[in-house]
Amino acid sequence: MKKITAKSADSITLATEEINMKKELIERLRRFLTAHDMIGTPASDEQVLCAEQELGVKFSSDYIDFIKNFGTAYAGMMINALDGNENVVEETKSLREVHPEVTDTYVISDDGSGNPIMINSKGEVEIYYHDSDAEIKTIAPSLEQYIEDNFPEW
């Protein structure tokens, strides 16, 4: 398995402490999702803890902020939470059945071509190119940044 980290002039380094999603971004998302009736079922603290234990991971604080506010919802791409048919637990388990070497991540979406979009133990957003020698590429330093980069407000 190859791991590639995208580097750019504007990339940031995350501190070791967890960073919560900016209030301004949460409010932008809330306005958009409410206007388009696209908010899922928000996750409870208990549901988050159970999912983390079942998957053996610790969710990033910005992912927790997102799913506790919006559940499964659209933010430039569909972000899977704990509700719905394509939820983070089932999608992560499905990936691990086929690719058992992927253990410290959880699947939050896909790219539309079947390549899972995941968050790793550092909180970085990665894409797993399952058809190209199991290549993993870091595409954003955090979920918050990934949403900022990909969220079009219609």
Give the positions of each predicted feature:
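A surface-exposed partner-binding patch
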Residues: A15-I117, F151-W154
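N-terminal amphipathic/basic-hydrophobic helices that include classical n-h-c signal peptides
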Residues: M1-N20
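Segments surrounding the PLD/"HKD" phosphodiesterase catalytic module and close analogs
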Residues: I117-L143
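A short, charged
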Residues: A140-W154
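Intrinsic-disorder/low-complexity loop/linker signature
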Residues: D10-S11, G84-E86, G123
